Amino acid sequence: MTQKIRCAGFGGQGIVLMGKLISQAAMGEGRHTTFFPQYGAAMRGGTANCSVIVSESPIASPMVEDPDVALIMNGPSLDKFESTVKPGGWIFYNSSLIDRKVKRTDVHVVEVRANNIAEEVGSSKTANMVMLGAFAKKVGTVKLESLLAALDVQLEGKNEKIMNMNREAMKRGAQLVG
């Protein structure tokens, strides 16, 4: 099975890290994967998105035009990518920052209070981890344990408090939808 994922939001929300973690988790599970970041203004607050493909077989192209799953962290990204998700696909959106509902009725919609939960954990910077935890639990493209292992690799060298907040945020996201 091949699954195409789009992560999108503002620069500084950890969008690229989300994609890296999904891709690394998939590799850790012995699957084929591609990771393709795209940036708007190259600064905090500009737009950022990335696409990830996870497959049991080799992947011909890293381009994702019609994702099966969209992990959306802000309103402009929902406006831009809502229409691109395949019918029957999934849209996870950060309802802490997005004040409208998903308009489509032909996709599964998961509302994630990512920033609210991240602040409860200790830092709004972990909102991306909340979203990843919800995605892992609900869709199962990669296992939560694989994402946590990838997190340890990607954030190696960070202080233990930051690591623990990110782990806890991911687990809380999974609990939210579990």
Predicted region positions:
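Active-site cofactor/cluster-binding pocket
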Residues: 1-178
